[in-house]
Each structure stands twice: as structure tokens, then as C-alpha cells.
Amino acid sequence: MQIYDKAKKDRRNKDLLNIMKKHKVKLNFQKSQDETWGVVLDSNNKNATILFQKCDNPAASLAHELLHIITQLNGYKKIELWTSPKLDTEDFNILMAALDNELQHHKFYNQFISYGYKDKEFYVDSDKYTEIILRPKINSYIKSNNISLIKIIPDFLTTIGKGGHISEESKKEIIELFYSINNNQYETQLKNIGLIKKNGV
């Protein structure tokens, strides 16, 4: 039995899977190349490929991806990635992908919890190390004195995201560190990003 078969049998996912049937969405499963789970929904909203990997909470991981699908079925339009000769498109597209992902998370986090899952099950297993990884990165941003806003926003979004292993107390402390980058040059922009995300735009 594949790990996703076990996840599909979890009673907490029954309603989510029924929604897939209602919308006639065919679920295909493909092993991920890394530790993460993910999903790609085709333009017709009829075929979804769920990337899976062995993890501690496969049922929660499946629920997470099904909620991504449902969010899009309910009208959410994914942010399109693009290229431009005037921008560092790699950094820009990393930013857009992170923003798109976090906006969807904001929309369905409460649903995830309502199905009986815990906030610490919202992300991949390695999320438990996110704070350990984040702090040295932020310190390097602070020391650089010339880091661009576009490079720090993905990590900022990770910090202010709902759920996960970072405590609220630590989040507040880390957010203040972000504000201090480049002598508080980006504080206003980062606060505005936080407000947009809080209000669910």
C-alpha cells in the first residue's frame, strides 16, 4: 500500500475526497523528487497530480494538497510566473511562487484545522527546523546592509504564515529582526505585506 492510499483512508479526508468526486477531479499520484508534497491542477480543473513523499503525517499532507485544489476550484486564480529583461526573474518568480502559496494557505488554514488536524501538521516534516534555518539567514541579511526587498520577502512570508512550528513569541521577535534590515529601510513595506495577508486579500 502506498503512503497516499493510507492517507486517503483517513476519515478526516472523507469530505475532501467527496468534493473531488463532486467536481469530477481525477487524482493522480506521483512521487516527489524531494521531501515535499505538492499539487498541479490542470487548466480545466479536471486532473490533479499530487506529488507525494514519505512523511510523518501523510493524511495531513494529503488534506493540505486537497485544500489547495478546492481553493482553486472555488475561484482562486494562481499567480502566473513570467520573465522580463529588466528584472532578476529568478528572484521575482521565487517571490511570486511564495506569495501565491501563502495566499492560498491563508484562505484554507482554518478549514485544515476544522478537519481535526493540528497547526504543526500544516507543513512538511522539516518545518520543525524552519526557525533554526531562518535566524542565520536573517542575520546575514542584516549584516549585508544592501540586501534587496525582493530577496527577503519569501522568508518574511514563511515567518508570518499561519500554522507551523514557530511559536507566536518567536514570530514577533523574528518579524522585528526583518524590520531592522538595511536600517529599517523596508519596515513599512513589510508591515503592509503583513496587513494584506492578515486581511486575506
Provide a role label for each language-model segment.
Residues 1-17, 58, 87-93, 115, ...:
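Short, structured coil/loop segments at alpha-helix boundaries
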Residues 1-45, 55, 94-102, 106-121:
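Auxiliary, metal-adjacent structural segments of Zn-dependent hydrolase domains
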Residues 64, 68:
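Histidine-centered divalent metal-coordination motifs
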Residues 126-201:
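Pan-zinc metallopeptidase signature
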Residues 79-82, 90, 97-98, 102-144:
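Active-site-proximal or metal-binding-adjacent scaffold patches in catalytic folds
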Residues 60, 71-106, 194-201:
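Post-HEXXH active-site segment of zinc metalloproteases
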Residues 71-75, 112-117, 161-162:
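Hydrophobic/aromatic-lined pockets within catalytic cores
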Residues 46-62:
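Short pre-active-site segment immediately N-terminal to the catalytic Zn-binding motif
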